[in-house]
Curated annotation (Swiss-Prot):
PANTHER family: TRNA 2-SELENOURIDINE SYNTHASE. PROSITE patterns: RHODANESE_3. Belongs to the SelU family. Residues 14-137 form the Rhodanese domain. Disulfide bonds: none annotated. SMART domains: RHOD. Monomer. Keywords: Selenium, Transferase. One of its GO terms (biological process) is tRNA wobble uridine modification. The lineage of its organism: Bacteria, Pseudomonadati, Pseudomonadota, Gammaproteobacteria, Enterobacterales. SUPFAM superfamilies: Rhodanese/Cell cycle control phosphatase. InterPro entries: Rhodanese-like_dom, Rhodanese-like_dom_sf, SelU. This is tRNA 2-selenouridine synthase. It comes from Escherichia coli O9:H4 (strain HS).
Length: 364
């Protein structure tokens, strides 16, 4: 059984999306995990806490004995069955615990006794995490071109279509605005950073990468924030601004926020609950900027939203949403973005409609 322990080995694991059987407790996994990891813990949260307390009070031998006592009999067999199935399903995978210590070695030895030889990550999650952090710092040093533009300019799609593009909003599972949430919950900060590092490593490995194409994001994307090393480089980057006609932007926003989100909610929850979730999603987005709109304007737009939802429910048409979306763009989102862009006007190197910006980016 060959353990992986060099920096290049760790990077290769992330680039290849090597399946990782992570045997840490669920609470540890939730705080941060690698993108291709599945959590099949040796100990659950309560068992881990009990062993930790025993270690502090009575030392390592007593803690180890308690661990074996807690994970025995039927409990051990159930977990063995899960590990065995995961190993057979992922023959190219590896075991991982916090630091490549006792937990992954214990699981490895139990599997070996059952006739399965399976490698483990020397250094564990901590080593992989440090590799992810270091890779992001290193790769962020390459030149960056940012795609800017008002809401509905199709920036994310443009980034997605570039071989050197990294979709930060897709990785964050959030579109960055008050209406930006998706049906997927956002990852923990560490897991988001690990996913970003893996995506940058994979993108870099596929080509002789000269520069990154990223969307012009603020520091926060929902509850996730960009790594400081990347954010700092983005503040210095050249910006290409998409300037599409207002009507085209409205078509994109109608497709993305009304048609697609309604479809996604009903697909996930069924027609009745999906409709309620969709309505709450739109109201929550508007409510998030209530203070900036002012109470009177917020109440007016919220009433127009209710009317639009009634129309959509009875006729299927989303046209009614323009009554509140158009003023929201013209009075709030567009002025806010233009103000932000003015502060970095010297960084703007190209302006044009979507197709023109796409051609310009490809030529860089």
């Amino acid at each position: 059984m060959q353990e992986r322990h060099t920096e290049q080995d760790y990077r290769a694991l992330l680039i290849a999306d090597t399946p990782i059987i992570d045997v840490r407790a669920p609470i540890e996994f939730e705080q941060g995990a690698m993108p291709a990891a599945i959590n099949l813990p040796l100990m659950n949260n309560d068992e881990r806490a009990a062993v930790g307390t025993c270690y502090k009070q009575q030392g390592s031998d007593a803690a180890l004995a308690l661990g074996h006592k807690l994970v025995a009999g039927e409990i051990r067999q159930q977990r063995m069955d899960a590990w065995r199935a995961a190993c057979l399903q992922n023959p190219q995978g590896i075991l991982c615990c916090a630091r490549g210590g006792q937990r992954s070695h214990i699981v490895q030895s139990w599997l070996h006794a059952a006739g399965i030889d399976y490698p483990l990550v020397e250094g564990g999650y901590k080593a992989l995490r440090q590799t992810a952090i270091q890779a992001t710092i290193e790769l962020a040093q390459k030149p960056i071109v940012l795609i800017g533009g008002c809401t509905g300019s199709g920036k994310t799609l443009l980034v997605q279509q570039q071989p050197n593009g990294v979709d930060l909003e897709g990785l964050a599972r959030h579109r960055g605005s008050a209406f930006g949430r998706t049906l997927q919950p956002q990852l923990s900060q560490a897991s988001f950073e690990n996913l970003l590092a893996a995506e940058m490593l994979k993108t870099d490995a596929r080509q002789n990468l000269r520069l990154w194409v990223l969307e012009d994001e603020s520091r926060m994307i929902g509850s996730n924030h960009l790594p400081e090393c990347l954010r700092e480089r983005m503040t210095q980057a050249a910006i290409a601004v998409v300037e599409d006609p207002f009507e085209i932007r409205l078509e994109r926003l109608n497709e993305e926020y009304f048609l697609r989100m309604h479809h996604d909610f009903t697909h996930a929850y069924g027609d009745e609950q999906g409709w309620q979730e969709y309505c709450e999603y739109l109201h929550h987005g508007l409510s998030a900027i209530k203070r900036r709109l002012g109470l009177q304007r917020y109440n007016e737009l919220a009433a127009q939203l209710d009317t639009a939802l009634t129309t959509q429910l009875t006729t299927g048409s989303t046209d009614g949403h323009l009554a509140w979306l158009v003023p929201l763009l013209k009075e709030y989102y567009d002025p806010m973005y233009r103000y932000q862009l003015e502060k970095k006007a010297e960084k703007v190197v190209f302006r044009g409609e979507w197709a023109e910006v796409a051609e310009w980016v490809k030529a860089q």
